[in-house]
């Protein structure tokens, strides 16, 4: 069989593939693809006759590579830090990582006192002391979870997202992201704002305590809270005098958990009626 055919066939039975059960031919094919991607021999997408073409079989090989390898210690760049707070993983062994059940990509930094739940994935990101990251959550590249911030289960914090946090003043409430939320790239949620369960925040949305969160269906304006199931984009509202507009976050639709589970995030954001 061709390399592509081996990958396609393996992907159809991917649920059966583990590091212990994968056959030699399949492992070799997957590793050949990964090496090819690493060297530039293969590209997941390339321009052919002026059109971008995606090679889905290469993506399948990447997904399969997660099935055939166990987690292992990966040494990062050697450096030194000078701080009062230790790093969470400073004394972790391979057994400890395996027991706790999350993945940590090189350059991700977590300070001692932050909690990372099972099945989380930390891309090169920063999680500060006192933060809680719920089960199954992805903290994507350059995302920041501030001190004492609470992130729910099955959340995706996209690239460059900031969940702001400060330890003082003591009376300030932490920013909270509920379960099953998606926070789009480069968005910021700060100042103790609560994003309730099942919300989808588009990229580039900034929400603090003074941000008006406008529900276009009801005309209601929220402060400091995004209601459950909201799909939110950035927008603006006119001033009372009508001479200018000021930034706001706009709730463009509501979705329930069933819809959120069936419909892709991109589809929710692209099917917005103006």
From Swiss-Prot:
Its main location: cytoplasm. It comes from the Bacteria. Keywords: Acyltransferase, Amino-acid biosynthesis, Cytoplasm, Diaminopimelate biosynthesis, Lysine biosynthesis, Repeat, Transferase. Its EC number is 2.3.1.117. GO terms for molecular function: 2,3,4,5-tetrahydropyridine-2,6-dicarboxylate N-succinyltransferase activity; nucleotidyltransferase activity. It is found in: Cytoplasm. GO terms for cellular component: cytoplasm. Pathway: Amino-acid biosynthesis; L-lysine biosynthesis via DAP pathway; LL-2,6-diaminopimelate from (S)-tetrahydrodipicolinate (succinylase route): step 1/3. It catalyses: (S)-2,3,4,5-tetrahydrodipicolinate + succinyl-CoA + H2O = (S)-2-succinylamino-6-oxoheptanedioate + CoA. One of its GO terms (biological process) is diaminopimelate biosynthetic process. Substrate binds at residues 103, 140. The keyword Cytoplasm applies. Homotrimer. Belongs to the transferase hexapeptide repeat family. This is 2,3,4,5-tetrahydropyridine-2,6-dicarboxylate N-succinyltransferase. It comes from Actinobacillus pleuropneumoniae. The lineage of its organism: Bacteria, Pseudomonadati, Pseudomonadota, Gammaproteobacteria, Pasteurellales.
């Amino acid at each position: 069989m061709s390399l592509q055919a081996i990958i396609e066939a393996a992907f159809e039975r991917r649920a059966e593939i583990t590091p212990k059960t994968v056959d030699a031919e399949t492992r070799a094919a997957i590793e050949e693809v990964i090496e090819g991607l690493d060297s530039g021999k293969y590209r997941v997408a390339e321009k052919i006759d002026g059109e971008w073409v995606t090679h889905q079989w290469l993506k399948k090989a990447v997904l399969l590579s997660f099935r055939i390898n166990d987690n292992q210690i990966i040494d990062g760049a050697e450096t030194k830090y000078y701080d009062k707070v230790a790093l969470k993983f400073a004394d972790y062994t391979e057994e400890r990582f395996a027991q706790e059940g999350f993945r940590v990509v090189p350059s991700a930094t977590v300070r001692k006192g932050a909690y990372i739940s099972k099945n989380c994935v930390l891309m090169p990101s920063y999680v500060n002391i006192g933060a809680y990251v719920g089960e199954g959550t992805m903290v994507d590249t350059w995302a920041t979870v501030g001190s004492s911030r609470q992130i729910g289960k099955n959340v995706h914090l996209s690239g460059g997202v900031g969940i702001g946090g400060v330890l003082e003043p003591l009376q300030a409430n932490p920013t909270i992201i509920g379960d099953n939320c998606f926070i789009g790239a480069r968005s910021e949620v700060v100042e103790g704002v609560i994003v309730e369960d099942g919300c989808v925040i588009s990229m580039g949305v900034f929400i603090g305590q003074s941000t008006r969160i406008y529900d276009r269906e009801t005309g209601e304006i929220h402060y400091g809270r995004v209601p459950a199931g909201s799909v939110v984009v950035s927008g603006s509202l006119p001033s009372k005098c009508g001479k200018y507009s000021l930034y706001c976050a706009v709730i463009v639709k509501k979705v329930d958990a069933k819809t959120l589970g069936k419909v892709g995030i991109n589809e929710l954001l692209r099917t917005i009626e103006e």
